[in-house]
């Protein structure tokens, strides 16, 4: 099985670098020079990382054999994957976005919404919850607030501090993609409750 970890955006400069929309919570591990990715479409790859650097909040990658802006432009929109077998020796206590989306969000016995997404951020991960009235609520994915994740029973248990749901209601006009601003491809990052607290 393959896991998408990034989507290539626009070229940067004239030497073949590209911007990357990061879809993993461990970019420092996933994009080191020498890393080889399976690519979709297959005609664009495979690709091997030659260089990786950050420009403000945007990850810039260079790939072996990609040396011009035109070559970089041909990669725009390509998706980068790793084999999930590579993750087996890593920590098993995390969850991918596709495992969380659709789970009920419970406060005690009451269902207060449904998970619609996961945002992996440098400081802490955020669970995106859609409330019954259609609002988006952002909940910090830390053990103190999300003490239980039960994928088998399809729910998470939340113990929100006072005012959490009022404070963290998402403005529908706000965007927060780092890297290439695209039409919201929210492929999975892997998150762990309490990891980034």
Curated annotation (Swiss-Prot):
Domain notes: The PRC barrel domain binds ribosomal protein uS19.
UniProt keyword annotations, A-Z: Chaperone, Cytoplasm, Ribosome biogenesis, rRNA processing
Its job: An accessory protein needed during the final step in the assembly of 30S ribosomal subunit, possibly for assembly of the head region. Essential for efficient processing of 16S rRNA. May be needed both before and after RbfA during the maturation of 16S rRNA. It has affinity for free ribosomal 30S subunits but not for 70S ribosomes.
Pfam families cross-referenced by the UniProt entry: PRC_RimM (PF24986), RimM (PF01782)
Domain of life the protein comes from: Bacteria
One Gene Ontology cellular component: cytoplasm
Family (UniProt): Belongs to the RimM family.
Native organism: Arthrobacter sp. (strain FB24)
Predominant location category: cytoplasm
Biased composition (Low complexity): 176-186
Assembly and interaction partners: Binds ribosomal protein uS19.
Higher taxonomy: Bacteria, Bacillati, Actinomycetota, Actinomycetes, Micrococcales
Subcellular location: Cytoplasm
Name this protein carries in UniProt: Ribosome maturation factor RimM
Region annotation Disordered: where it falls in the sequence: 167-197
GO biological process: ribosomal small subunit biogenesis; rRNA processing
Stretches with biased composition (Basic and acidic residues): 187-197
GO MF, one annotated term: ribosome binding
Domain PRC barrel per the UniProt entry, residue ranges: 92-164
């Amino acid at each position: 099985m393959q896991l998408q970890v990034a989507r290539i955006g626009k070229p940067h400069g004239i030497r073949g670098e590209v911007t990357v929309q990061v879809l993993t919570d461990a970019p420092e591990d996933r994009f080191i020079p020498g890393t080889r990715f399976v690519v979709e479409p297959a005609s664009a790859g495979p690709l091997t990382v030659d260089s990786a650097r950050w420009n403000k909040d945007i990850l810039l990658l260079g790939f072996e054999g990609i040396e011009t802006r035109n070559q970089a432009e041909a990669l725009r929109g390509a998706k980068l994957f790793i084999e999930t077998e590579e993750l087996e020796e890593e920590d098993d206590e995390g969850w991918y976005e596709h495992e969380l989306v659709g789970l009920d969000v419970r406060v005690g016995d009451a269902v207060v919404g449904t998970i619609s997404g996961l945002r992996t951020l440098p400081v802490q991960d955020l669970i995106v919850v859609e409330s019954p009235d259609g609002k988006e609520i952002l909940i910090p994915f830390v053990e103190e607030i999300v003490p239980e994740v039960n994928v088998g029973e399809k729910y998470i248990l939340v113990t929100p501090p006072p005012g959490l749901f009022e404070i963290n209601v998402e403005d529908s006009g706000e965007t927060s993609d780092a890297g290439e601003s695209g039409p919201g491809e929210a492929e999975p990052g892997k998150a762990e409750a309490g990891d980034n607290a």
